[in-house]
Amino acid sequence: LDEVLVTELGQFGWYQARNILLAGIAIISSAFFSEYVFTAAAVPHRCRIPECGETSKSDIFEPEWITNAIPLTGSGSLESCERFVGLGNGTLDYCPASLFGQAREECEEFVYGLDISVAYDFDLGCRDWVRALSGTVSSVGTLLVLPIIGYISDKFGRKIALVISVFNLALFGVIKAFSVNLTMYMIMQLVHTTLGAGIYSSAFILAAEMVGPKYRVLTSAIQSSLFASGQMVMGLIAWGIQPWRYLMLALYTPCFLMVSYYWLLSESVRWLLSKHKYEEARKVLENVAELNNTTISEKSIAALMSPTENSQPKEDKQSLVLRIIRSPILLRRVCTTPIWWITTIFVYYG
């Protein structure tokens, strides 16, 4: 196929540019899975003081009497997780220092300075580990998605895998925005990444495979850069839309439009050839030639669709496993690449 791209179809033309653009939009959206950085962000919080008439987590964060009830940190801000022990009862308007001793105790209830995060809606208070768990669950999902998307890509095609992934990205992202409790939010976080985080790999393949060897490295660099650009886009949106539910709706609702890729993108030619779908592969190749204003000869099409190279008997799974075990190079790669991947995930996501 590379030889045909170089000599006939063109290494880079309108077809390749269109694929990179469409796949690039999908890759940008794949960066939105890191939205938990904003949706589960820490917000200012302090102990709720029922002795002073406070009854809600949305009470005024810094009333005039607050330093009578809550100690200050070394930087002059209110302690987030401790308060002075109460000795009597006051009101929201009058709560003097005489109602509190100097001994400290941990908070049981909280008042929040902002209502833009999961921490406020689900009253997480000082349970920072719960907020961090959101990112951990997301990372687990990115691990679980690999065999799932791999199976779908091999069985049904790269385009189908991409369309399913972007649909799941949009659907479960919107559902997550309507989470009614912490349990639902965490489950949706796991389902969201497990069923939707295969976007990057599928889009990357569709963008790069029909680009000629001369431009393939550049295309790969562009796709990787677009993922980073997606994180910047997400940051800008989060800057303008801070309430976490609205932020998620703003990020994921437009992603439903990418379901149209089922009609806009062509299936992977290499996959079609590997599955002996020769007529479909021919149509894609002719479409490439038409958009690039080039031609492809019948001889080249016949060579690509010749079953000669596929006529060799296939090895069964057991033979393939034994072949890997007996090859020092393959065995070393099989053992080390998972470690590289896991290490990269820990380093990248912290």
Range-by-range predicted roles:
Residues 26-34, 137-145, 196-265:
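Glycine-rich segments within core transmembrane alpha-helices of 12-TM secondary carriers
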Residues 114-115, 120-125, 184-198, 254-256:
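Hydrophobic core of transmembrane alpha-helices in multi-pass small-molecule transporters
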